[in-house]
């Protein structure tokens, strides 16, 4: 619903904006070619694209856009992907008709707490947001158009998982007593 205050006056739905659709398709195209979040962000900036708020692309915003299922077309492949990853699916496979996009809910945890330099007169708050595991998401078919084929979106998720696995390896452990403390001249 839209409107202000407690009484909402009308319902609104996601609508396709041609420039945004082209930008998202370009983002996925560049990532598929480069297989690099940083190179994708740099190329998007080089081509003159900006985020919704007018900022330059960075690795964080690029990763968020690539992981967002709202751009994925809701079809049988998407349904099976979320089923395999224990996503909370609403509706059955017949709802995933290949005509609409996916809507995902309950994707983030948000915490708000008082900052250390907050005062009674001038309160300051810090808000932390972290992404929940896919198994806690609620997945449904939206009324909006999907911008990216489910195959391309799933391939992108697999590439992102490979990148995360590559860079999230535990550091080497050594039993040497002075390892990291003593250096050769």
What are these language model-derived features?
Residues 1-185:
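Conserved catalytic breakage-reunion loop centered on the nucleophilic residue
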